[in-house]
Amino acid sequence: MKTLKSFFLNINTLLLMLAALCMTACGNDEETYSDKDDDTAIIKVGMAAPSFELKGLDDSKVTSESLKGKVYILNFFDTTCPDCRKEFPVLQQIYDNYGDKVPVLNVPRSQGVEDAEAYWKENGLTMPIYSDGAQRLYFQFATRTIPRTYIINADGIVIASFNDRPIADYASIERIIRK
């Protein structure tokens, strides 16, 4: 009897832990583009984006300074992340429709750019990928959670932030960049 009781207690504990994991991974669908309740964000909406220099796959460089005067999107991702994969077509559509008018900077958080590039090729993505080296830029923005997408205005101020709650959608991004 004691063994059976212990078995059910262990199963219940496991189910409770799985439910908690699912709730933290999926988030909610609340429409918000502010990160005021995001305790993992270091740079929040209304704050200046930090200075940075990223290297493209073609050895080109992009810097925060070179983007002054433009609205741009900074996306941190991993190709193994399901929510990131959902967001890629949205960002690709923004890239296709706005091109250099609204640069989309895709930065792998914890995987090599080679793996990201392979995923891009397999899935027909053409937007650029940039290297952050040792995740320095990511950790200036946040402590964890991907996808993490920021929209930065022409003055270098973060005007919107999306993470996995909610992930970025085309209509929301377009509404923000058109303001």
Predicted regions and their residues:
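Thiol/disulfide oxidoreductase modules built on the thioredoxin-like
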Residues: Y119-L125, G133-R178
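Short active-site neighborhood of thiol/selenol oxidoreductases, capturing the structured segment around
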Residues: S64-R85
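Structural microenvironment flanking redox-active thiols in thiol-disulfide oxidoreductases
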Residues: R85-N123, G133-Q140
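Loop/turn elements at helix/coil->beta-strand transitions in domains of secreted/extracellular proteins
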Residues: G69-Y72, D100-P103, T126-M127, A154
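N-terminal targeting signals for export/organelle localization
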Residues: M1-S51, A171-E174, K179
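Short loop/turn microsegments at loop-to-beta-strand junctions
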Residues: A49-P50, Y72, I146-P147
